[in-house]
Amino acid sequence: MRQSKFFMPTLKEAPSDAVAKSHQLMLRGGYIRQVTAGVYAYLPLGYRVLRKAENIIEEEMNNINVPEMIMPHLLPATLWQESGRYKKYGAEMFKLQDRHGRESLLGPTHEETFTEIVAKNLKSYKQMPLALYQIQTKFRDENRPRFGLLRGREFVMLDGYSFAATREQLDEQFDDQKSAYLKIFNRAGVTVHPVIADSGTMGGKNSTEFQAPAAIGEDTIATNEKGTYAANLEMAKSIDTFKQDPEDAKELTKVATPGMDTIDKLAEFLKVPATRIVKSILYIADDQKVLVLIRGDKEINEVKLGHVLDADEVRTANADELVEITGSEKGGVGPIGADWADKIVADETVKGLYNVVVGANETDYQYQNANLDRDFKVDEFADIRTANEGELDPVDHLPLKFTTSIEVGHIFKLGTYYTKTMGADFLDNNGKAKPVIMGSYGIGVTRMLSAAVEQHLTENGIAWPKEIAPFDVHLIQMKMKDEAQTELAEKLEKELSTKYDVLYDDRNERPGVKFNDADLVGAPLRITIGRKAKDGIVEVKRPTDEKAMEVNISDLDAMITKELG
């Protein structure tokens, strides 16, 4: 490809609103251009990278015998209403009406459609296991699109779906997909950690995220140094090493605590450690009033709490509700005499505490020396706390390390979440009707490309992993009027193009302009044809090299083969 004919509008400086390095470099390098907030055009350079990533996906899916298909972008609302997700998905769904007033949506994902089109056509256990996938544009009405391709309103995604007659088949499919995904990320040069994750609005109870460590990441993952434990912070567990020595129960005492509406203030006022205080927070779970208790030095993890409560909507009570229900403003709520609570849920840290401080359900008052069972009851204990860095992991009891990361993939064991609701049954080997068992698998393809850039930054540009680089070799001719340089450059272009993707910079530009653009192209090998062309010598440089090396063209083929294969 001749660079003089290649549309690659580069920028000297990134726009001021581009915060992420990947966003800055993709704009500066002419990979993408914004059309509107969160929506981008993929210019030739960006589209080449995208297509190479898609080719890797296709090859790895073929290796596990998963065929590709395509579903429509425009979906009827009735399918999502049938599954119950039309309302649950919330404001992020793009909804529209046709001229007849029929409601539709732009697909953010396709579980319902695959259930309707595929699962409902699987009538016998003999037709399974089966898996399918597609690569297509998805739509999500992000409230704050940002970071370029990392959080957009339109994005390219691989989404795959598996169909099984037994749980054992689903487990095998899940493992096959996980293995294939790890190969995809490895080939794309993206370092990932498979981590325990929350399934969110997707449904199901078991899911794994693929998190790519990056400074700009919006997620936090918790890992140990051996790599035997990894979880999204939303789901991370840790061992609580605090132990309170047993004490005899003391007399329950009500004390005034004016203005002490935080744990720190209360602990200082009462001269007790935070571990001697039990926080009480009122949540509204659908139509239930749930009082949630946790030791004062810990924070509630609302994702974990949501799993325990298993409600469609879980939120903290607002100030008016708090006073109306409990009789107290913030800071004074507690479990003693909390007959208004439909349920009391406590974190495991509340067990084994003696003579603690709890709210008295009266503004500016607390109880001291409260004891579980004697003074208040708990309906359910569960791990609902947020893990802290440095706490011990539950596998090898090693300190947890937190890392910011980008979610680039997520796989789910959906089970019968959709097929039961939507009536997708098959006949088992005994002729009994059962719901099809499903899995769902996704890679954010455009997000993966941004993660690759974030992980392969150079001082002045990008060092693309070789399998997704837009070009394998970047030929740069220094002087276009130099006949020896032109002859050698055209010879190398012809020879190398039979095996590699070659970009030949034949522009009549200054060397500085060419080198700056080459840094943004980030090809694995840059070959410069300069003043020693007449001697058969070129300069070769990798993006991560500080200096170029001189190579005789007789040795060039062997060197390129060694580098690129």
From Swiss-Prot:
Lipid biosynthesis among keywords: no
Catalysis performed (reactions): tRNA(Pro) + L-proline + ATP = L-prolyl-tRNA(Pro) + AMP + diphosphate
Annotated GO biological process: prolyl-tRNA aminoacylation
Keywords: Aminoacyl-tRNA synthetase, ATP-binding, Cytoplasm, Ligase, Nucleotide-binding, Protein biosynthesis
Location in the cell: Cytoplasm
SUPFAM superfamilies, per the entry: Class II aaRS ABD-related, Class II aaRS and biotin synthetases, YbaK/ProRS associated domain
GO CC terms of this entry: cytosol
Coarse class of the protein's main subcellular location: cytoplasm
Gene Ontology terms, MF aspect: aminoacyl-tRNA deacylase activity; ATP binding; catalytic activity, acting on a protein; proline-tRNA ligase activity; transferase activity
EC number: 6.1.1.15
Classification via InterPro entries: aa-tRNA-synt_IIb, aa-tRNA-synth_II, aa-tRNA-synth_II/BPL/LPL, Anticodon-bd, Anticodon-bd_dom_sf, Pro-tRNA-ligase_IIa, Pro-tRNA-synth_IIa_bac-type, Pro-tRNA-Synthase_IIa_type1
Highest taxon above the source species: Bacteria
Role this protein plays: Catalyzes the attachment of proline to tRNA(Pro) in a two-step reaction: proline is first activated by ATP to form Pro-AMP and then transferred to the acceptor end of tRNA(Pro). As ProRS can inadvertently accommodate and process non-cognate amino acids such as alanine and cysteine, to avoid such errors it has two additional distinct editing activities against alanine. One activity is designated as 'pretransfer' editing and involves the tRNA(Pro)-independent hydrolysis of activated Ala-AMP.
Subunit structure: Homodimer.
Domain remark in the UniProt entry: Consists of three domains: the N-terminal catalytic domain, the editing domain and the C-terminal anticodon-binding domain.
Protein family (similarity comment): Belongs to the class-II aminoacyl-tRNA synthetase family. ProS type 1 subfamily.
Descriptive protein name: Proline--tRNA ligase
Species the sequence originates in: Lactobacillus gasseri (strain ATCC 33323 / DSM 20243 / BCRC 14619 / CIP 102991 / JCM 1131 / KCTC 3163 / NCIMB 11718 / NCTC 13722 / AM63)
Taxonomic lineage from the root: Bacteria, Bacillati, Bacillota, Bacilli, Lactobacillales
